C-alpha cells in the first residue's frame, strides 16, 4: 500500500469495500472489486476482515485468565449487555492433562515428552526473560497460561489470599482489605478449594518446631521476627498437632493470619460424586458447558456472552482516546475486527496486558515511535514498568537414620490431588535482622516469606548433579522460603509493533552486587542496603529454614523418631557459619557483603565475608522466579482506582498487572479478586460484593 493516509481494503467474500488506514495495521489483500475514491482521514478504520464473522460487543474482554473468565461470567449474568471474551488458547475441558490433578505431574505425557504444562507451548506462552545479570545471565522461562483459565489452568492451584497487611499498607485508598475481602470470599466460595487431611509425620514435627521458635521469639521481647503476629498477641499462631486440633485458616476472612503455620494449603481441586478429583480453576468454573456451549455461545441467561478461542489479539483500535474496536488474528492467520459499543477490558496478564496497550499506542511515545507504532494514543512511559514477582530460594535436607525410620518419618509425603505436592507449612514475617523491613514493622505484621515443604529434590537438574543429589534418593525433602516481598522491579517492552504472537522483552534483574565508590562509607551504606536487598532476604530465608530444621531435630526425637536432619543444599557448613555470624555481627551483618567497605580484616571477619560470598551463589542458580508476575500496569501508574487506563475514555485493565503490590503468596486469588471487583465497577452496583455465599457457579464435568 502506497497511500500512508487512507487506503481501501476490498473484502473478497462480500464484494464490499471498507475504509482501512495504514496508520493502524500494515495489512492488505487482493482487490477483487473496483477501487472507490477515498478521502484521506487521520482516524483508523476497520481493517480488512471477513464481514460474515464480524462481532459487535458492548464489553470486549481480552484474555480468559483468572480475572477474565470470572468477569465474563458475572457480567453476562448480571446485565443484558453483549459480552465478547477473546482468548488466544483453547478450552481444554476434555483434556486430562488439565482436568486431572495428577495430569499436572505428567501422568498422561509420553515418556519422551515429560514436560509440564508451564513448559509446553500447547498450554502456555513461553516468555523467556532477557538475560538476568544477577543470575549469571540466565534466561528463565516464566510460565503464562494460554487457554480458558489462563495461568490457573497450568499451575498447582495453591489458593492464597495474602492477609490484611499488604492491602492496608501497600494498596491505595479504595483497595484496602475491608474494601476487597468480600471479593476474596467470592473467589473462595466459587472455587471451593480442598485441604489435605492426610497426616504427615514430618509436617507435625515441623509445626511443633515452629511453635517452640514462636514461643522463644515472644519471650525474647523482640518487636519483629518471622513468627511474631501482632494480631494474635503473645500466643503462637501455629496449628496444634493434637488429635483434636482445628486446622488454622491462612485465608481467614478478616485477614488476621498474615503470619501463621498450618498443616495444609488450599488447593483448587474438587471431589466428584464418584470419588475422583478434578482440578477446579477459572476456566471450568466460569466458562463450563452450563454457561457456554461448544461453539462459544452463552446458554440461557448467559446468552449475551460469546467466547472466541484461538483469538490472538493484535491491538485495540482507537478513535481519539476512545476504543472503538479490537483486532484479533484467528488460527488460520486471518485478521478480524470486533466493534466495541461501551468498553474494552484487558485481562491478558502481567506480560501481555502492557504489550497490547503498547501496540495500541499507549505507552512511552519516544520508544513506540522508534519501533514503528504509528497510531499513538496516550503518552505514558509507566506502562509496562513496575513488574514484580516472587522468588523461591530452595533448600534440600537429608534425613539420617535407619532406612525404616527414615521411611516412617517421611511417610505420606507423596503428591496427591488434595495437596498437589505441598505438605504445608507457614506464612512468615520479616527476620529480625532484615535492615529493609518496613518502618512500621514494629506495630504491623507483614507477610514476607511463604514456607513450603515438599518431597524430593526441588532444585534444577544441573544443580542436582553438581551437588551430588540424586532425585531418586528416598531420604531428601525440600523446604522453600518463597520471598513474597521480593525487592527488584522489572519492565516489559514490545519488540515490534505488529506481531502479536512475538514474546515481549521481559527485563528482570534479580541479585545485583554492590560496587563501592570513593564516597564515605556512611553515604554508601543506605544505597548498598537497597541494592543488596534481594540477597539479604534470600540468606535470611535460609537462616529461617536452618532454625526450623534445628528445632525439628529436637521435636523429631520428642515424637519418637530416631532421625537427624542436615541441610545439604546450600551446604550445612555455610548455613551454620551464616547463623553464627548473624548472632555475632547483629544488625550490621549484611555489611560483610561489601568487605572492602566494612574494613574488617580479622580472620573471623574475612571468613564471614567469604561465607556470604559463597552463599550468594545458591539463590542465583538454585532458585527461580515464580509465575507470580504482576504490577506491570498498576493502579496509580497505568490505571486509576476504578481500573480505567489513564488517558483513555473506555479501556480498563482488570488482572494482576493492575495490582498495586504483589499479594502475600500465590497470586491467582488476587487476580480473581481484581476481576470480581471490576464486575461491580463496570455495572455500578455491588452485585458480587453482596452476593450470598451459597450462590455459586455449578461445575459441569462433561
UniProtKB/Swiss-Prot annotation:
It comes from the Viruses. The active site is at residue 628. It is an enzyme of class 1 (oxidoreductase). It is found in: Virion; Host membrane. InterPro entries: FAD/NAD-bd_sf, GMC_OxRdtase, GMC_OxRdtase_N, GMC_OxRtase_C. Its EC number is 1.-.-.-. Signal peptide: none annotated. It is a single-pass membrane protein. The chain crosses the membrane at residues 55-75. Keywords: FAD, Flavoprotein, Host membrane, Membrane, Oxidoreductase, Transmembrane, Transmembrane helix, Virion. FAD binds at residues 58-88. One of its GO terms (molecular function) is identical protein binding. Its cofactor is FAD. It holds the Pfam family GMC_oxred_N. GO terms for cellular component: host cell membrane; membrane; virion component. Belongs to the GMC oxidoreductase family. This is Putative GMC-type oxidoreductase R135.
Amino acid at each position: 500500500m502506497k497511500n500512508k493516509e487512507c487506503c481501501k481494503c476490498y473484502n473478497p467474500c462480500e464484494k464490499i469495500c471498507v475504509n482501512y488506514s495504514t496508520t493502524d495495521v500494515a495489512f492488505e489483500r487482493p482487490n477483487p472489486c473496483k477501487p472507490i475514491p477515498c478521502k484521506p482521514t487521520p482516524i483508523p478504520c476497520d481493517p480488512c476482515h471477513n464481514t460474515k464473522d464480524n462481532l459487535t460487543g458492548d464489553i470486549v474482554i481480552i484474555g480468559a485468565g483468572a480475572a477474565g473468565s470470572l468477569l465474563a461470567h458475572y457480567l453476562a449474568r448480571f446485565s443484558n449487555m453483549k459480552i465478547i471474551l477473546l482468548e488466544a488458547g483453547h478450552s481444554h475441558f476434555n483434556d486430562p492433562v488439565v482436568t486431572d490433578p495428577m495430569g499436572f505431574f505428567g501422568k498422561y505425557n509420553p515418556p519422551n515428552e515429560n514436560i509440564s504444562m508451564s513448559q509446553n507451548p500447547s498450554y502456555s506462552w513461553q516468555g523467556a526473560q532477557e538475560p538476568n545479570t544477577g543470575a549469571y545471565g540466565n534466561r528463565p522461562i516464566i510460565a503464562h497460561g494460554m487457554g480458558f483459565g489462563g495461568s490457573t489452568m497450568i499451575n498447582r492451584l495453591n489458593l492464597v489470599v495474602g492477609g490484611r497487611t499488604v492491602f492496608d499498607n501497600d494498596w491505595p485508598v479504595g483497595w484496602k482489605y475491608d474494601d476487597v475481602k468480600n471479593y476474596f470470599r467470592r473467589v473462595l466460595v466459587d472455587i471451593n478449594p480442598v485441604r489435605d487431611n492426610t497426616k504427615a509425620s514430618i509436617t507435625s514435627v515441623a509445626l511443633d518446631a515452629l511453635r517452640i521458635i514462636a514461643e522463644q521469639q515472644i519471650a525474647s521481647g523482640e518487636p519483629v521476627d518471622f513468627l511474631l503476629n501482632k494480631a494474635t498477641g503473645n500466643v503462637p499462631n501455629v496449628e496444634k498437632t493434637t488429635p483434636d486440633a482445628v486446622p488454622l485458616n491462612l485465608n481467614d476472612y478478616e485477614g488476621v493470619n498474615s503470619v501463621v503455620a498450618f498443616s495444609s494449603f488450599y488447593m483448587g481441586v474438587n471431589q466428584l460424586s464418584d470419588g475422583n478429583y478434578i482440578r477446579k480453576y477459572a476456566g471450568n468454573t466460569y466458562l463450563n458447558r452450563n454457561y457456554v456451549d461448544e461453539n462459544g455461545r452463552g446458554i440461557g441467561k448467559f446468552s449475551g456472552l460469546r467466547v472466541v478461542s484461538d483469538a490472538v489479539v493484535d491491538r485495540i483500535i482507537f478513535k481519539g482516546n476512545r476504543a472503538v474496536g479490537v483486532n484479533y488474528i484467528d488460527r488460520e492467520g486471518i485478521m478480524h475486527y470486533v466493534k466495541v459499543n461501551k468498553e474494552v477490558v484487558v485481562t491478558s496478564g502481567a506480560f501481555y496486558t502492557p504489550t497490547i496497550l503498547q501496540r495500541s499506542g499507549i505507552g512511552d511515545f519516544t520508544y513506540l515511535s522508534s519501533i514503528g507504532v504509528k497510531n499513538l494514543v496516550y503518552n505514558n512511559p509507566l506502562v509496562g514498568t513496575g513488574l514484580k514477582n516472587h522468588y523461591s530460594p530452595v533448600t534440600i535436607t537429608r534425613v539420617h537414620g535407619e532406612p525404616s525410620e527414615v521411611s516412617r518419618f517421611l511417610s505420606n509425603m507423596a503428591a496427591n490431588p488434595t495437596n498437589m505436592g505441598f505438605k504445608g507449612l507457614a506464612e512468615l514475617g520479616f527476620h529480625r535482622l532484615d535492615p529493609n523491613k518496613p518502618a512500621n514493622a514494629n506495630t504491623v505484621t507483614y507477610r514476607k516469606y511463604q514456607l513450603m515443604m515438599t518431597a524430593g529434590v526441588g532444585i534444577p537438574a544441573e544443580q542436582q548433579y553438581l551437588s551430588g543429589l540424586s532425585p531418586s534418593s528416598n531420604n531428601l525433602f525440600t523446604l522453600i522460603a518463597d520471598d513474597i516481598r521480593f525487592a527488584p522491579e522489572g519492565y516489559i517492552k514490545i519488540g515490534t509493533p505488529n506481531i502479536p504472537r512475538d514474546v515481549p522483552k521481559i527485563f528482570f534483574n534479580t541479585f545485583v552486587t554492590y560496587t563501592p565508590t570513593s564516597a564515605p562509607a556512611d553515604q554508601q551504606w543506605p544505597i548498598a542496603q537497597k541494592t543488596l536487598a534481594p540477597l539479604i532476604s534470600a540468606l535470611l530465608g535460609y537462616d529461617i529454614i536452618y532454625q526450623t530444621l534445628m528445632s525439628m531435630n529436637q521435636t523429631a526425637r520428642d515424637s519418637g523418631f530416631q532421625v537427624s536432619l542436615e541441610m545439604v543444599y546450600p551446604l550445612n557448613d555455610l548455613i551454620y557459619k551464616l547463623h553464627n555470624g548473624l548472632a555475632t555481627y547483629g544488625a550490621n551483618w549484611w555489611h560483610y557483603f561489601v568487605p572492602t567497605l566494612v574494613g574488617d580484616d580479622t580472620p573471623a571477619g574475612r571468613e564471614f565475608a567469604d561465607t556470604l560470598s559463597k552463599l550468594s551463589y545458591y539463590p542465583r542458580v538454585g532458585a527461580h522466579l515464580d509465575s507470580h508476575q504482576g504490577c506491570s500496569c498498576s493502579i496509580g501508574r497505568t490505571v486509576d482506582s476504578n481500573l480505567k487506563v489513564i488517558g483513555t475514555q473506555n479501556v480498563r485493565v482488570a488482572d494482576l498487572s493492575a495490582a498495586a503490590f504483589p499479594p502475600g503468596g500465590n497470586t491467582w486469588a488476587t487476580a480473581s479478586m481484581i476481576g470480581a471487583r471490576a464486575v461491580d465497577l463496570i455495572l455500578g452496583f455491588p452485585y458480587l460484593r453482596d452476593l450470598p455465599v451459597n450462590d455459586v457457579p455449578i461445575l459441569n464435568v462433561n
